[in-house]
């Protein structure tokens, strides 16, 4: 009943401590890849409550991609015990125009019963809640499981020096995570509404058509890459991606950008590029999708270049004892039965 007790401690008895610690985290201007002391703050608190910290920095200051990551564990003395881990990120997206915020985004202002600030829900508040819940329960009893925290500073960025490399390290050191809760905000309308148990895959790519410069008055001397790319995009839009997978939304393909870099209306450009993304269920994979994509290149006179920008596989967590316990715990605290969902964009849960 560990998860249930953690949630109860969090919501019913520990609110003020959670809020105070979350405020301390929000004050840190940790816009990716900057840390601004956020990990140091976590380490200090975790050490006090009996966790052992492992610093896992990846990248370099020289390349402006140094990411501070942390794996912290409170190891149970019981042999062959299981580990329950909470995965979170300390980095946040840029705050934009501060003048358009009601309160300073890095102040952590409490007003109207709400905590305001960049990262309050995504996800400094969640990290604070987990740590304070662990603190509360560890003061009261010895556990027969280990509690862990995996934190990255590279979730909102390109995600190359964050969770994916931490997981590689854990595998090398044979540190096993049996169950993991990722603290992303998953509730569209109210607390306890939804648990994300999987995500569709995501394939992002560019298609560039190479033609030949020319004046629009002499089209026979040119080769229009725009016409070729429009033909390809039309074919892609008409692809039948209708294979259904239980518990997953339908697969969809979206053209998100078409650009020539040509500001002139009377000149045929040399090249044209489109950016495209496919969100796909477990009935598809990258190899199958690429085969369909390349088939659309036929019948165009221009040279076609395909470049994969990013590729993430779909994943799904089947129902088990831990998931069932989590559902019951959420209902006990919120009186709401959570929906198990795979909607939305990819998260770094896929690495775990």
Task: Describe these PLM feature segments.
Residues 81-148, 172-173:
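Active-site metal-coordination/substrate-binding segment of hydrolases
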Residues 50-59, 107-110, 303-307, 333-340:
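Short secondary-structure junctions
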Residues 24, 131-139, 231-238:
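Short glycine/serine- and small hydrophobic-enriched flexible loop segments
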Residues 13, 186-190, 197, 203-351:
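Metal-dependent amide/peptide-bond hydrolase catalytic core
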